[in-house]
Amino acid sequence: KSLKGWKEIEYEVVRDRYDNCITVCNMENFDPLGIHTGESIVIAPSQTLTNSEYHKLRELSIKIVRHIGIVGECNVQYAFDPQSEDYRVIEVNARLSRSSALASKATGYPLAFVAAKLGMGYGLFELKNSVTKTTSAFFEPALDYVVCKIPRWDLSKFRGVDKELGSSMKSVGEVMAIGRNFEEAIQKGLRMIGQGMHGFVENKELQIPDLDAALREPTDKRVFVISKAMHKGYTVDQIHDLTKIDRWFLNKLKHIIDIDEALKRRNINTLDKELLREAKVYGFTDFQIARAVGLEGEEQNMHKAMLIVRQLRKGFGIVPVVKQIDTLAAEYPAQTNYLYVTYAGVASDVSFSNDRNSVIVLGSGAYRIGSSVEFDWCGVQALNTIRKQGYRSIMINYNPETVSTDYDMCDRLYFDELTFERVMDIIDAETPHGVIVSTGGQIPNNLAMYLDEQNVPILGTAAKDIDNAEDRAKFSSMLTENGINQPEWSALTSMDDIDKFVDRVGFPVLVRPSYVLSGAAMNICSNKDELTRFLQLAANVSEDHPVVVSKFIEHAKEIEMDAVAQNGEIMAYAISEHIEFAGVHSGDATIQFPPQKLYVETVRRIKRISRQIAKQLHINGPFNIQYMARDNDILVIECNLRASRSFPFVSKVLKLNFIDLATKIMLGVPVEKPNKNLFDLDYVGIKASQFSFNRLQKADPVLGVDMSSTGEVGCLGDDSSTALLKSMLSVGQRIPKKTVLLSTGGAKQKAEMLDAAKMLLQHGYELYATGGTSKYLTENGIENTLVYWPSDEGKAPQALDLLHEKKIDMVVNIPKDLTPRELTNGYKIRRAAIDLNVPLITNSRLASAFITAFCNVSMDDIDIKAWGEY
């Protein structure tokens, strides 16, 4: 039955074997029913239920859990009609789910820990509340704050993807914001997602042709559509009719708009203390206030404008307080280390010492494509080392899915924003020994210069050296001075300059706007038309926003160096090679370590160049350099003065914890250089990427310079074929039983695939091939059956029909180049393979390696060994 427009409510219930039952947390979706819970903004505790409605659903949840007889933790989801108080149970999860992780972070009640103990036969009354250490676990947490969970989508990375939200989950991460009122929590949350938004108001204008349609059909930008509609004068009732979002939430959002309008009527000189305080209480940042009172136009620099408001605010004595999450709504005296920062309070719940013996680690924020659990691993390892060295550890992060936001990982956890303003608030309160910015990916790295200007002690590599590596022009001139090669590039500010540059170096070229993580908005263009079209789409070329164009070298190996240095001298390093050629983003590539096919001379040169770079940049701590090698020519692509996403992988293969070593160096603890023999391994590790194309309807599953994987696996084997086979099976590829469909792109790729095709034939596989590939295989004496492209209508056999009839076990489809025409033809075959769950490989190097692996290694040959046995 369709219940569109009803509310979606969830309860988390815990029951022990003595039949004691409590509800730990109830949550409410901001969006009405019809959108997957993982795609909705979720608020805890529920805000719009009346007392009787709340208790009615609570008693039902307990009844359900008792009836099923669950011992442990259970999650009950309802659809609820506020008009008639009618309800339906949508589902019951008798396991720890995504909602339970949120519930335990939101309440501070350790659900998984309690559920495990209950499973062992303990009663609720026998367990201690591990947050407060003084009360038992047999109580229902009370919250004196509001928590708001917002999903993060990365839909713009995929060609042709469907942006509408529904019952299939497409988000890749989430954030959790804590505030004293709904307005504060939602504004914090919208900033935390990290997509360039500053809250509910004062963002870049969205271009929306049809507002009514955009309100009716939920997409990943719906909240900002509501903001625009309210600015345009839509009433709460009009928006409610279109979106079915509860009027209570809409009235709160309207309140934010009202404060914004009031600010817009002032300038910096007429801004009074009362209005400034009110704006801060309801979640406005100094940045939003500066923009609203028109400082942006005067200063021409938003950071400067924000500092002016910060100074004014401190002059008025408006500073935030630190509150703790103690599961008891402060009704019982308890000390916890789980904290958030707010302006809606009088005094802080915790005291601060001035001994400068604490170290702050900045976390990695929301999981997204390009920055995921790898950086969280780095942050947690750093916290462990800091504690072992006798410092107090402080973590700032806001992602409820991470280990770093567990309250027992560090001495103090600030569950709050990683913006300059908030980090400075916390530094002002804590006066730490130093701050670590190199273990959280790009977000902390971008803050380094701003923090340094405020004289914040940054541990490890100095901020100006970080800037020298991040700023392409400075980094490039340093390479040139030291005689180190790099792909020819130029930062250009007009179309004429771009044309001149391209005429000089020739196609293909790599085009990218400056300062990005995970290759967002990068593209390889192989002719004039593509170049013009891409520049119109992705970047408005101007004086302030130059576009970097560099020569792209085809068929070059990509090699990475992950290392740790002390005072510019390399202490430990790991050189790994990509199986795919350069042109596939390093986060999507399949990586082998130690490298299997590099010339000794190449490795020697890479070590030499890395030593030079480390010395020039005075590196202290972790860094990563990416190289391109063709024959023995070695070019530097980029250098990051922070831990990279391959750090956990190389640390585990080498059994040497790079982050532990780096943290000791940053703290100034003397370390010994690891033994040389450590770096000679007699086994191979392979890191493969996990893709989620089946969830992203209509997206083209092809790999390019823009990162699109959502996870990864690491496997060890006695040789590279065994390790590769394990890792491909781990990411859900299957070994084909009988038939393989080949369509292998340009002449170079066809030649690369020839040996693999012969091998398939020798091992009894039947080959199907499309037009050009079929002709090429036949010329080389390889039997195959010709199949037709979707564009050859009326001819048979059609590739798509064979796929639908389940006659194909694996598809190797390699686009000649990434032009739209070429992509569209192969797109239908690639998309059909994904939708019909047929293994698909779109890279010739990876396809050859995988085919070689499954032809030469049988499943019986694979040993199962523990990590320690290698």
Question: Which residues fall in each region the model found?
Answer:
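ATP-binding N-terminal substructure of ATP-dependent carboxylate-amine bond-forming enzymes
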Residues: G189, G297-K304, Q311-F316, P320-I484, ...
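Conserved anion/nucleotide-ligand pocket segment
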Residues: F507-S514
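Extended, domain-scale alpha-helical bundle/helix-rich regions
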Residues: A279-Y282, Q288-L295
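Conserved A3 ("GATE") glycine/threonine-rich loop of ANL adenylate-forming enzymes
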Residues: E470-A473, Y515-A520
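ATP-dependent carboxylate activation and anion-phosphoryl transfer catalytic cores
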Residues: K1-E274, A279-G283, H303-A305, F316, ...
